[in-house]
Structures are given as C-alpha cells and as structure tokens.
Amino acid sequence: MEGVGGGGGGEEWLRPMDAEQLRECGHRMVDFVADYYKSIEAFPVLSQVQPGYLKEVLPDSAPRQPDTLDSLFDDIQQKIIPGVTHWQSPNYFAYYPSNSSTAGFLGEMLSAAFNIVGFSWITSPAATELEVIVLDWFAKMLQLPSQFLSTALGGGVIQGTASEAVLVALLAARDRALKKHGKHSLEKLVVYASDQTHSALQKACQIAGIFSENVRVVIADCNKNYAVAPEAVSEALSIDLSSGLIPFFICATVGTTSSSAVDPLPELGQIAKSNDMWFHIDAAYAGSACICPEYRHHLNGVEEADSFNMNAHKWFLTNFDCSLLWVKDRSFLIQSLSTNPEFLKNKASQANSVVDFKDWQIPLGRRFRSLKLWMVLRLYGVDNLQSYIRKHIHLAEHFEQLLLSDSRFEVVTPRTFSLVCFRLVPPTSDHENGRKLNYDMMDGVNSSGKIFLSHTVLSGKFVLRFAVGAPLTEERHVDAAWKLLRDEATKVLGKMV
C-alpha cells in the first residue's frame, strides 16, 4: 500500500473503494481527528492567518501522481489547521454554536459510506422513511401540534440550513397567495418581520421575487429584549391594507441572533390568522432548548404557525448540516416545489404511496442526513440531551453573574438561553458611546487566540456576544474567559486616561 502511507503509490490509487485500503486509511483518519480534539485547546480559537495565506504554501496546479497519506496529514497539520477557526473549541463563544459529537460524526461517516442521493423514495427507501420517523420523533419532543406530524396533513423534512427552510416556506406562502389573489398580484405581496429577524429572510425575499419595498422591517421593542411588538406589526399591516397591498407572510423568531429575543408568537399568530397570512417561526438556535419542559413555553403559539424550523446542527450535537422544517400542510410545499420529469417517474411515486422529498426542497439531490440525527437520539437519549442544553444555560448564567459582579461591565439585555449580551461601560467623556472601547477589547481578546467573541449593535450600542454552546466547554473555560476580559478591560480603559 505504498500510495496509502509510504512512497510512490501508482496503481494502488486506481482502486478508489478498496475495503482494506479504507480500513487502514479510516483508522488513521479517526486517530488524527481524535488527536485533534485532544489538543484543540492548543490552537488559537480564531485563525490568525492573513487573507491569501494558503496560496503561498500550496502549488498552483494539481499533482500528476498520487501523494502519500503521510504527506497529506503533514500538510493538514502545517497548512490547513492554521487557517481553521475552531468552532468545537471549548473557548469558542462567538456565533451560535455548530455542534459536533461522536454520534454525529459516526452518522456522517455512515452517510458518506452509503453515499446515496435520496431525492425520491425509490432511490433509497430507508433514507426517506427514517427522515419521516425521526422528524416525527423530534416534533413530539418539542410538543408541536399533531398537524405537524406525517400522520396528519403536515410533516417534517431536513433542509441544509435555516436559510433554505425559510426560503421554501416563503415560496409555498407566495404561491398560495398568488393562487388566491391572481398571478399578477406578486407586486402587491407584503412580508412582515422585525429588524432582529435573520438576514436569511431578506435573501429569501430577493430569490422569491418579493419587491424590496414590500418587506416591512418593524423596529423591535428594546423594552422587551428586542422582541417585536404585535401592535407595531398590526399598524404596518393596516397601512398596507388601506393602500391596496396584500399582507401574506409573517416571520417570527424564537431566539434572535443578536439578543436571543423571543417574539410574541400567540399575538403574531392571531394577526396572521385574522388576515389569512402564512405564519412562519424561525427557532434555528433556541429550538433545541425547547425540548426541556422549563423552556417549552417559548413555543406557545406554535399551534397558529404554518411552518416551523430549527437547526439540529447548532445546539443539538448533530454535525452540520441538519436544519429541521415542519409544515402544517405539506400540499402547499409540494405544489410550489414539485417537478416530475419523465426520467424521475416510477411506480411508487405515481401511486402517491410514498414521500418524495425532492418536492420539499430547492435542489433535486439530497444527503442521508437523518442517519446522524437518528444516531444522536439513539446514542444520547432525550434525558442526556436535555442535560446538555441545561449545562450550557447554567454556564451562561454563571458568566452573567460574573459580569454583574464588576461595575465596569453591563449586561445589555436579559439572558434567556445561553447567550449573554454585554459591554464595557464607557466613561461619560466617550463621545463614541463605547464603540471603539468595546471593539478594542474584543479585538484584544480575539487576537490573543485564547477565546473568540463576536459582536452586534443594539439601540446604537456596540455589544459583545458571549454564546455558550461548544460541546467541550466547562466552567473553567468560562472563568478563564472572564479573567481575560477583565484584564483586557483594564488595558483598554487605561489607554483612555
């Protein structure tokens, strides 16, 4: 096996799927990954390379002959890893998490081994049927209304990202509205969201042909942790109705990106219902927490929703990508996204006896993503997954208390889940209201490589985000981050004197 570990290689690499070669290489890759995780704290959390660094160290054309695995591992260690920002580091507190786990990793391995393209039931019945079953399991864990189950008119499907989930929901809503009001009414369709809604909705509107001037961005209520005020939505809607426009879609969020705000679902749901609008709920981040009984109330009002999404790949130990979408009536999704060319026709599909997930998504091809979610649920169980969520929320609460113990800092919004929004309080003489002060503090700790934070802007304030959610994070990592922040705060405040 020269091409695997030793010298030349030659014909060894003309067998792309040899079981024994896979066994040897696979063992070595698993060892490499395990060693990476064991030593992950030794790496700077935020990559410290400069743009274009990789072009300087890799050749400008592909090799004519096969290289060795040893050489490849060396290049990964010396050239690739320096350019990796380590999302699985226990000191990663920047964006909402992207969880990995042994179960998720094993599921990805098995999915890669089967390497099916499961666009219809016939292409791999197990892929379709497992997805239906696991999404029903998850809906029951979240206590979603029975209409979202596959046994009713609705059902669940795995999308790549929440952006895709929001897009397909919007397309279904658009086509439902056009069917009711006429195909020439597109220019009158209006979407409602808040200024805290994820930018994915804006992109979805661009793709769906919704006029930019018909996207109502309602300013969130800073007195309600930046949740949207139903009264403001109703007011905007009334103005649009009087102008002859057609309100057709409301997007609410459970756990906004900037502050983890929870929009008032019951009130927004009633607005949507009263005006025959599609009501979508994006719980990409915080949906995972709602498997815990003490956080389930944040989904009260979901019974009025037409669609609901959350990301298992964020905070549910399921490797990226795995975004879960449920709809109350799958026919609207299928009518909007279905295509049926001759080469895809088959007996099972023609008999309408199976689910073809190609008609629930944008692309034709799809991966066997339900495997990893199934393995996460099987190997960890709901009780342990709830404990995992609670641990992160406890660590965020601990960090919040540390902030409150130092008068130099302020917690900008009340903590709801595992995100803490805070800033260094600027001196009264600071005409920038702390923007540069907090940017410099963030840049200082990020440049150290010891932790990674991100920021947002709330009511004009430059605010730092401390998002707990990496699988390896313990209390000692939170304490170390706090010490680093205090030291950096002393440094940047000293420069202002």
UniProtKB/Swiss-Prot annotation:
It is an enzyme of class 4 (lyase). It catalyses: L-tryptophan + H(+) = tryptamine + CO2. Its EC number is 4.1.1.-. Its cofactor is pyridoxal 5'-phosphate. The modification N6-(pyridoxal phosphate)lysine is found at residue 314. InterPro entries: Aromatic_deC, PyrdxlP-dep_de-COase, PyrdxlP-dep_Trfase, PyrdxlP-dep_Trfase_major, PyrdxlP-dep_Trfase_small, Pyridoxal-P_BS. Pyridoxal 5'-phosphate binds at residues 162-163, 257, 311. Keywords: Decarboxylase, Lyase, Pyridoxal phosphate, Serotonin biosynthesis. GO terms for biological process: serotonin biosynthetic process from tryptophan. One of its GO terms (cellular component) is cytoplasm. GO terms for molecular function: carboxy-lyase activity; L-tryptophan decarboxylase activity; pyridoxal phosphate binding. Involved in serotonin biosynthesis. Catalyzes the decarboxylation of L-tryptophan to tryptamine, which is converted to serotonin by tryptamine 5-hydroxylase. May play a minor role in serotonin biosynthetis during senescence. Accumulation of serotonin attenuates leaf senescence. Belongs to the group II decarboxylase family. This is Tryptophan decarboxylase 2. It comes from Oryza sativa subsp. japonica.
